[in-house]
Structure formats: structure tokens, C-alpha cells
Amino acid sequence: MMKKIFEVQKPIIGMIHLKPLPGSPNYDKNKFDMNAIVKYAVEEAKILEQAGVNGLQIENYWDIPFVKGEEIGYETCAAMTAAACAVKNSVNIPIGINVHMNGGKAAMAIACASGAKWIRVFEFVSAYVSYTGLTEGIGGELARYRKMLDAKDIQLLCDVNVKHGSHFIVHDP
């Protein structure tokens, strides 16, 4: 699967950590409005591409404190789509989307709109406890959403035992 996206088996994926987006408690349009956020993302993308990474993952990393996937707002999706489209149009390497925290459906929608090649999902199966509370696996829901969008060309990069919390189950089946 990795060669399908990156043309190498073990890619180096650079991270584009977007500044706080509209809707985030830390968003300050006087300091970083959307034009500045997009400009910064594009500058970072070009630097990382020149450094030789094989792809770029765009994340709302500074939208802290994070909310669970089903609580992610439309404003986050809109802002991330604007940034992702600008980044994609400024580089010649593939991009992917990760929406904190476990926002697989939001990431899939953004990927469809922006032409991203993959999404990252923190918890595809099982459940874990993190600073956002109980986060449940979204594999079944995401598979159905992906089918509905006819997005089989968008790959899923999913964590197992994600670093962002402790698993809720006490015994693996």
C-alpha cells in the first residue's frame, strides 16, 4: 500500500501542524487569520518537500484542547480543506489528513475535497481513554462513510494501541 501512495515502501512523512483554526479556543484572527494560516502551511510544505520527505500530513495539531471526532465543527473542516488545497497545489508530493481527535469522517471529507491520498485514524477498532474521554473505534462507521463517498482511492493509515491514551479493554480477544 505504501508504494501505491509514495513510490517507496518506507516513506518519510512530514507534518504540517496548522496554527489554531477558527473554532479552536486558541484561534486569534488578529495574530493568524486564515490567510496567514494557509501561507504558513504552504511555506512549511515547501521546506519539507525540499528536505526530501515523501509526503505531507496536515493536522489541526494546535486546536487544543481537542474534542472527540463527532464533536469536530464544520469550521474546522472548512479551514483544514482550505489549507489542504493550498498545500496540495504548492508541492509535488502526496498529502494526507489527520483531524484530532479521531476525526476520521472529517478527515475523509477533507481528503475527498482536497485530493489527499490518505487519512490517519487514531482508533480504528477497540476503545481507549484519553484527555478527550472515552474514544471508540470508528472502523465500521468510517468504512461505510468511505463507501458512500466512493473514496476507495483514499488510503487509511490507522493506529493500533494509539499513544494518546490507555486502552479501555482489559483483555484482547
Indicate where each model-derived feature is located.
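Conserved anion-binding
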Residues: 21, 105, 109-173
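N-terminal small/glycine-rich loop or linker at the start of catalytic domains
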Residues: 2-33, 149-165
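Alpha-helix N-cap and loop-to-helix initiation/capping positions
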Residues: 29-40, 71-79, 133-137, 170-172
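Glycine-rich anion/phosphate-binding loops
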Residues: 30-45, 99-106
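A short, N-terminal amphipathic alpha-helix
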Residues: 39-54, 86-89
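Alpha-helix-loop-beta-strand connector modules within alpha/beta enzyme cores
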Residues: 8-9, 14-15, 67-97, 136-158
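Glycine-rich, proline-tolerant flexible connector loops at the mouths of alpha/beta enzymes
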Residues: 52-79, 125-131
